[in-house]
């Protein structure tokens, strides 16, 4: 460890198989060469069901130190996380405490009281939990007790300019007037990349047959949660319009989605609950088109991952997806215009390259770990300098 190296503690409540868990590891990787990096995993059976409590802090071979605190759930953790969190902070005396999402905002005042000299940083990804469910008692309570204290953080980082603007509208000057930076999100270019040789039409057909998709002449892919903002209904309508193409969706197959599939008799829709990253790469590479019709996204990684793997994407011209992908791939003006997505599919299956390769390379460079690390450490260096004044 370098002399005078500042130490930083990242706080995350989800495992490495989730997007937040992977992002936490990406952040640790980004800073571990310049900072003494630690991570506190706030563990619950929901996200760490296959793990046992560790007796000691663990030095990870990836260059950081892991700590953990257990609770039965994030709800009970609202109370039970506090005391052991304070104890860890007193022992570590970190220079910076970095929270991975606003739902952990209830711990910001705890950190400020336990380590008044430490700078707190909050990563803001979107404002969907805050704004999309105004009549939900669950989300009202989540906002009031968990998220609202987020504004007490010393500084903020955002995944997109769009998110930064939306956060300013919702949280107001308590957030917008504090130090902040857009750091984006990275993709693992060692994993999400083109194969050494192009995937042939026969290889794609063989891939489909192996996974039970027989007698289809193409495959579309969608990776998403079942939330109204994801606009999965339009993806299914696209499937109805092109019955000779297989439409794969990765994500939970809810009762609502099952009802749509059954009602429309969508025999060409195939659901997979989840993949590990390497399986997902194979689906990206063997798909003909990634379809991402979301009304709202804070960033939108899946279409970027798909393009990195050599497969084109078509997306809705909305929110942060527009910010990231305009000029790179086709964007549909009206997010629920299923025929417009189907028309792009027809172009792809006819052999047209719908991607601007130069713009795509620029995007992938911006989303590389190297670029991400530069933005993250650049912002944290500023915080360190301000702290030492």
Across the structure, where does each feature detected by a protein language model lie?
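Short hydrophobic beta-strand element within catalytic cores of glycosyltransferases
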Residues: 312-315
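Membrane-proximal helix-turn-helix segments that form the acceptor-binding/catalytic region
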Residues: 138-156
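N-terminal strand-loop element at the rim of the active site
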Residues: 13-18, 30-76, 163, 178-179
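Aromatic "clamp/platform" in nucleotide-sugar-dependent glycosyltransferases that forms part
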Residues: 295
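Nucleotide-activated donor-binding/catalytic signature segment of Leloir-type glycosyltransferases, i.e.
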Residues: 258-281
């Amino acid at each position: 460890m370098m002399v005078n190296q500042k130490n930083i503690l990242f706080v995350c409540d989800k495992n490495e198989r989730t997007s937040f868990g992977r992002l936490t590891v990406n952040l640790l990787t980004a800073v571990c060469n310049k900072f003494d990096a630690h991570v506190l995993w706030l563990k619950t059976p929901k996200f760490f069901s296959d793990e046992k409590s560790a007796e000691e802090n663990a030095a990870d071979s990836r260059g950081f130190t892991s700590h953990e605190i257990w609770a039965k759930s994030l709800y009970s953790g609202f109370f039970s996380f506090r005391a052991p969190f304070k104890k860890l902070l007193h022992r570590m005396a970190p220079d910076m405490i970095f929270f991975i999402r606003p739902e952990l905002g209830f711990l910001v005042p705890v950190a400020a009281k336990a380590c008044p000299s430490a700078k707190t940083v909050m990563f803001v990804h979107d404002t969907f939990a805050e704004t999309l469910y105004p009549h939900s008692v669950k989300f009202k309570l989540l906002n009031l007790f968990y998220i609202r204290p987020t504004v007490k953080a010393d500084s903020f980082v955002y995944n997109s300019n769009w998110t930064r603007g939306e956060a300013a509208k919702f949280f107001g000057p308590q957030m917008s007037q504090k130090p902040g930076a857009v750091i984006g999100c990275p993709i693992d270019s060692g994993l999400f990349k083109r194969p050494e040789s192009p995937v042939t039409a026969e290889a794609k057909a063989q891939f489909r047959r192996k996974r039970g998709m027989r007698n289809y002449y193409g495959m579309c892919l969608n990776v998403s949660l079942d939330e109204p903002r994801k606009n999965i209904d339009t993806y299914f309508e696209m499937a109805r319009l092109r019955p000779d193409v297989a439409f794969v969706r990765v994500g939970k197959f809810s009762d609502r989605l099952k009802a749509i599939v059954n009602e429309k008799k969508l025999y060409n829709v195939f659901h997979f609950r989840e993949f590990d990253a390497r399986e997902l790469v194979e689906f990206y590479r063997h798909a003909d088109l990634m379809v991402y019709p979301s009304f709202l996204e804070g960033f939108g990684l899946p279409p970027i991952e798909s393009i990195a793997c050599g497969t084109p994407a078509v997306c809705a011209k909305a929110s942060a997806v527009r910010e990231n992908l305009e000029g790179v791939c086709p964007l549909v003006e009206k997010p629920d215009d299923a025929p417009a997505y189907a028309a792009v599919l027809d172009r792809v299956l006819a052999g047209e390259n719908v991607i601007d390769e130069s713009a795509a390379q620029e995007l992938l460079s911006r989303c590389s770990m190297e670029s991400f690390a530069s933005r993250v450490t650049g912002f944290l260096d500023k915080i360190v300098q301000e702290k030492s004044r």
